[in-house]
């Protein structure tokens, strides 16, 4: 019976029968050879092909995956990890604590669902994690006869398509979403890279589906931008005073111009009305004020290579490809006196909320999902299950220490670091911004303490994995902006893999570069110290590498890449890769005992000591930081240092907190107040509820556009995949004629000449057999006869165009027709997106008239979509009948 350290009886009882079946199969599979295991895997795939029933395959597929993992990686899935895999397969979110092996757990449902041959996507938050997991976990899948794919930034279309064809593909949320948008802009089927969606497992699911839910993924084109207005608006802000000319709403990230402010600006600009629709200044002024009052360098963005780079508030990482919309990004560029880049218009867009709902089967993993369970259930229909830990948690979460102001708090943090550092206990300090991480670094320098800093600055980002991996070493101090999505585990005593990587990199580059110098023997006395304690075989392998011409041609960067990506570990191909594989194994064996000693020393010191320097808006982010210590039953401690003027309390703490701040409290003494602790918890809950309502509101509005998008993309894909679109052309033309005749029937006063009517309809003059007199009025004709006549004339005109174009070669006509429909579909959709954006802004004002903005939005959006379809028909027929190859 499975032990229950988490007291989650209902979950264990639900899956106990399956766990027992999997464990029973384990002994049977252990007796099989590698080839017999692979043959069993092929039998499972055949069973599914015949029965189309995955449920019956769960026990054997999970047992197979467990055995394959043990044979390839030396890692055996614990029973609690089997539960995690079963939860994921049931289309749920598995909440697993840090270090409990989420990456390994995902292999269980991934292998099972890959048996359908419909593809599985494992989505991670960055390229590094996607590459790392594909290389390591891919060994399990390949052992069982499956292939894996990997999508990385900058990969060409051909490679993307091939990797998406794999049984299991590792990809970032960013890449797969943009591939979806690009696929739905393709003019040729060979440019489409994705196949139909099947099953998706999202790692750090709360980061993607909640924290980034409000950020749409956009493909855009540059449009003309009044750069001088941004520059002038930025200069005007120097002449405006806070609370006199404008007010700042920090909660809603907005600024409000006062009447005095409007007059002051109108006087400076010598204009009568800032809101004049013919020459509006107000959006530029508001954005300039926002840029000055609400967005700060080294907090919300950094300046790099004369560009504004956004910093993700949840992960602390830079988002080089993201830009703020509605002119805000240009306003910040003007504020920082940087070159102002062009504004853009949206060509295609989708939110993560709607994108991931396209998967028929969706699940996710996170260390912190339970606090957001309501949102997961209501928007994504995903429940959250807390997976028991393999070992009881030993982490101690100490009470918050609350200081009067920022100055006192940061001094206390530095003093605490100094005290803990004296005993050698490793420390990880979490900060919320680049600016604060660098300020703390200066304070620690005054204590002459050594530290590593990890924030959005490029020089620090490059060393992210190494910094995080070594944060558990004795005596280390690591300062990091938010820890979400930093996939490397913090191992007490340091991460042996990174130690070996660094040592082996030094050895290999020394061997390669020394050989090139040709001055002396590689193992002369001056270099012998580099290999002290190594075995004779280890030294022999180094000698063979020093004579391997392929190895000697590698650059230092090539060697680093091989070691980082572990290419040589997974599938050694060349002789030098086999040699490096041996060296790694040898160094692991040699260093393992020392690593175990270091690990025990740090455990005896109390494990990793976590310091939080501010409560975040979300409890999940705080828990992500705390969760960095106490992994796999290790000891650890966490404590938050707070001040009464932290943003959370200042903006959302309420009037009682404001009054509390006025009392006489010693600057250097922390407060222990149950009232303040409850106020903090209450403030976080209010902010979370507020954020949830904003995301829910966005989802409700975006759902309208999403339904329209699905229709357009479905119709577009049908056109793209059609051998011939002649039926569509006929349908468009006949629908145009039918709509016109309905209009004529309703409007008896119409007096249009037949020749003009046809020319307007089809973009050309026709030979009129039915109507002998060009001056004959439509009103004098029988509409049913006219309908037959116009249908015939349209068909004749179409056939005439086909004959005209057929001389240019086979397939030309089909490609032209398809391209005309696709190009006009994209053009009208692009214009529709702009109109929908304007409509979204406009309906908000209707609420002041006691009208429901969402209802108004739906009604107007429906009408706009109907007119879009009508316009498409007219443009396609007009362009086709007027088209010419030359």
Swiss-Prot record:
Its EC number is 7.4.2.8. NCBIfam families: secA. The keyword Ribosomal protein does not apply. The lineage of its organism: Eukaryota, Sar, Stramenopiles, Ochrophyta, Bacillariophyta. One of its GO terms (cellular component) is chloroplast stroma. It catalyses: ATP + H2O + cellular proteinSide 1 = ADP + phosphate + cellular proteinSide 2. CDD domains: DEXDc_SecA (cd17928), SF2_C_secA (cd18803). PROSITE patterns: SECA (PS01312), SECA_MOTOR_DEAD (PS51196). GO terms for molecular function: ATP binding; protein-exporting ATPase activity. It is a peripheral membrane protein. The keyword RNA-binding does not apply. This is Protein translocase subunit SecA. Keywords: ATP-binding, Chloroplast, Membrane, Nucleotide-binding, Plastid, Protein transport, Thylakoid, Translocase, Translocation, Transport. SMART domains: SecA_DEAD, SecA_PP_bind. GO terms for biological process: intracellular protein transmembrane transport; protein import; protein targeting. It holds the Pfam family SecA_SW. Changing residue 183 to G: In strain: UTEX 646 / Bohlin. ATP binds at residues 81, 99-103, 489. Has a central role in coupling the hydrolysis of ATP to the transfer of proteins across the thylakoid membrane. It comes from Phaeodactylum tricornutum (strain CCAP 1055/1). Signal peptide: none annotated. It is found in: Plastid, Chloroplast stroma; Plastid, Chloroplast thylakoid membrane. Belongs to the SecA family.
